[in-house]
């Protein structure tokens, strides 16, 4: 992956947020076929990049992305409807907004150790079969992992709520869920045997 092909004027920045791509950046992806994205760690003003904005790379056809470790928040639909196969999320990341990685081709997601909330549909319609949730995770939103390839799943003690359809359209036949978790009755498929402990 050639980091040097990406320049500041490929992106739109506002303060410490990356809002999206300029026409020059879009052309690099669409016309030149540059689909391996390396996001800069610093803004043009020298600030550490903290946020990737809503819809920043929506439908951009990206096949891979390197997200700097300074990023704390990934916005709504930021990487929605791309072609990402795997993603390593930054250590600083706390918030993953709704639809952030919706409808990609993800088979691998690596979390940092600060993520607390996975908002609705954040990873819906991917190809995930396994995942290791961080020990900081508290909330798994509605349809967060709708239509993936899970057959088994386990949750850290930190999780307090799993919302409606979070794991619908997967192939999980049996799952253990702690009594301390507020589990929506439609979180899993009707055939999933849920054991509370």
Residue ranges and their predicted role:
Residues 3-19, 28-51, 60-73, 82-95, ...:
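Structural signature of tandem-repeat unit edges
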Residues 54-55, 75-78, 97-100, 119-122, ...:
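Consensus positions within tandem repeat domains that build extended binding/scaffold surfaces
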